[in-house]
Amino acid sequence: PEADKNALARRVALDLTGLPPTPEETEAFISDSTSGAYQRYVQLQLNKPAFGEHWARMWLDLARYADSAGYADDPLRTIWGFRDYVISSFNENKPFDQFTIEQIAGDLLPNPTTEQLVATAFHRNTKTNSEGGTSDEEFRNEAVVDRVNTTMSVWMGTTMACAQCHTHKYDPITQEEYFKVFAIFN
């Protein structure tokens, strides 16, 4: 059976913003019997800042965003600009190809804007360690491995971790291909 307008209002708001609609929004939608009421209600939800915040959260999980370094001393990082870039990109309905280019190579665009430079913080969303006794070269290498694996899983929908050690006859990516991608991010 078709959902009633009250349930529909709730489902749309929760799906698009992660938040329930206000009582006023629900009442306005229920009482609007004109053509296009549903489309207007959807647009109302899409125009809320909560839309970008809700959908950016899922992208930020994929991008391994965190406000901390991820280790025992766990100092705060100043990476919130990347979070805000992702939220505004969703709220502005930025085309996905542009969103992708800016995160992978925004700094390589001709005359990059501050926003495009901030977008490349996608590559900085990796664990950082400032503890004494760590090997800078080893840690740099681990960060490159993390960038390769994350970039491939986010944009290609496949993991490359196995190819880091060996070529497997059932995996689509060989060890040689893994290290070619590694060389790009190194």
Residue ranges: model-predicted function:
Residues 1-186:
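Short, structured secondary-structure elements
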